[in-house]
């Protein structure tokens, strides 16, 4: 299995710290609002990575944090007249509702930053004792000049960043690139006692502390959205490696942006879609199929047409499964399909080959469609029950790491199609050619064609 490592900018063979285990940390949401469809892409991508590791037999320790103390949270809580804790509790609850709606597997642990204040203080104190941090008027900063490898993840030269707009300007700091580990108390903000006076932690130190506490000094995979490479992940590396003297993470993974109608998503452009918005319109499996239809390192464009195309594609796959289900009671028990059963197994091998190559979900999905096409051509009423059952099982097996094809259809597809055929026959008798043509075209759009036979009208699936 190969993973593209942002740190080395190349694909590397995956070798975990502990055999057959994966220690994985994904940066989670700041809980002051509903998460948007761009966040959903990141969460679904790394949920799929986790599911695929499990499919391949690994035990995955999957940590995703909640940032529940932050400038944005404080501002919103003050604006609403509630405590930061009340705001965090509310949106953590909303997060779980939307995450469950997207079929995200629950994390092994979802630590909250405010649960780690004591350990964060100890972490910062350790950095200060080793000469990597300094205190000014109750604020504690990380000394980037003391960490000689600063910039190795993002490729940013420290000197080039001195006057950068992404760095907070503070004349008290030794270097403009130095960042806050601990912030002194300000009016209207939550604060905790510390050796430097009352205050609260900086953003970057929270993840370093929680990851180390729950996963150890060196973890296998640290992941997040591409916009976290700098400064967040760069600063995490500096803090963690300065504190432990060990590599923080063996592999760094980052998911690319999601645009809306070829524009960056933003509230000012009125194109800001929350996961909850999209879940009102589309099933979770449709959303997952769309968001996984491109490789996770490739930017993806969301349009109404593209999500509708994903919906149609998913229906085609379910049509194949449902057609197989309708054949189960009409199979030839004595037929020898042993060669075809072996041929079906080749699709599992192809799927693994694609997914082992840096979790290439786009190519993995293509394998599933190739499998469906093969099934539609080769499995029919003359096939053995073993072949039909194997085909159903394999479709669902390959869909599982992607979080698709896991639903059991509640309706009987055969009865539904037969009902539509009868409606079409009645329309033709009544010379309602428009309705008859519409029913025929609707069925064709679903991959179903009608055939006139001496025994009456029959239907079958085709690959569109």
UniProtKB/Swiss-Prot annotation:
A motif ('HIGH' region) lies at residues 29-39. GO terms for cellular component: cytosol. It comes from the Bacteria. Disulfide bonds: none annotated. Its EC number is 6.1.1.16. Belongs to the class-I aminoacyl-tRNA synthetase family. Monomer. This is Cysteine--tRNA ligase. It comes from Clostridium acetobutylicum (strain ATCC 824 / DSM 792 / JCM 1419 / IAM 19013 / LMG 5710 / NBRC 13948 / NRRL B-527 / VKM B-1787 / 2291 / W). The gene is cysS.
């Amino acid at each position: 299995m190969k993973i593209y490592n942002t740190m080395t900018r190349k694909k590397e063979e995956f070798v975990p710290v502990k055999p057959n285990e994966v220690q994985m940390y994904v940066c989670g949401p700041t809980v002051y609002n509903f998460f948007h469809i761009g966040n959903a892409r990141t969460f679904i991508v790394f949920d799929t990575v986790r599911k695929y590791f499990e499919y391949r037999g690994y035990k995955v320790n999957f940590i995703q944090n909640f940032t529940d103390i932050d400038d944005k949270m404080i501002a919103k809580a003050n604006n609403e007249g509630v405590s930061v804790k009340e705001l965090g509790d509310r949106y953590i609850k909303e997060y779980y509702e939307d995450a469950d709606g997207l079929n995200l597997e629950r994390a092994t642990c979802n630590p909250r930053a405010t649960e780690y204040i004591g350990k964060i203080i100890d972490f910062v104190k350790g950095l200060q004792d080793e000469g990597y941090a300094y205190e000014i008027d109750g604020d504690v900063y990380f000394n980037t000049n003391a960490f000689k490898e600063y910039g190795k993840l993002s490729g940013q030269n420290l000197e080039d960043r001195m006057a950068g707009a992404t760095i907070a300007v503070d004349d008290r700091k030794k270097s403009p690139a130095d960042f806050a580990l601990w912030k002194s108390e300000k009016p209207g903000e939550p604060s905790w006692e510390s050796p430097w006076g009352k205050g609260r932690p900086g953003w970057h130190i929270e993840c370093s502390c929680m990851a180390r506490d729950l996963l150890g000094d060196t973890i296998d995979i640290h992941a997040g959205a591409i916009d976290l490479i700098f400064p967040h992940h760069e600063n995490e590396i500096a803090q963690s490696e300065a504190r432990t003297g060990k590599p923080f993470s063996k592999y760094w993974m980052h998911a690319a942006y999601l645009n809306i109608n070829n524009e960056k998503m933003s509230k000012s452009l009125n194109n800001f879609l929350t996961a909850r918005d999209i879940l009102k319109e589309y099933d979770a499996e449709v959303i997952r199929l769309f968001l996984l239809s491109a490789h996770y390192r490739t930017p993806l464009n969301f349009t109404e047409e593209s999500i509708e195309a994903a919906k149609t594609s998913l229906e085609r796959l379910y049509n194949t499964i449902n057609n197989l289900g309708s054949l189960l009671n009409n199979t030839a028990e004595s037929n020898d399909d042993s060669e075809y059963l072996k041929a079906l197994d080749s699709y599992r091998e192809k799927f693994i080959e694609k997914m082992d190559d840096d979790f290439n979900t786009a190519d993995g999905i293509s394998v599933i469609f190739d499998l469906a096409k093969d099934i539609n051509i080769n499995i029919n009423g003359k096939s053995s029950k073993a072949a039909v059952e194997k085909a159903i099982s394999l479709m669902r097996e390959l869909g599982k790491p992607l979080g698709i094809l896991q639903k059991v259809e509640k309706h009987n597809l055969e009865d539904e199609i037969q009902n539509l055929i009868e409606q079409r026959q009645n329309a033709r008798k009544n010379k309602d050619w428009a309705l008859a043509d519409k029913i025929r075209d609707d069925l064709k759009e679903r991959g179903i064609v009608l055939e006139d036979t001496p025994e009456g009208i029959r239907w079958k699936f085709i690959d569109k």
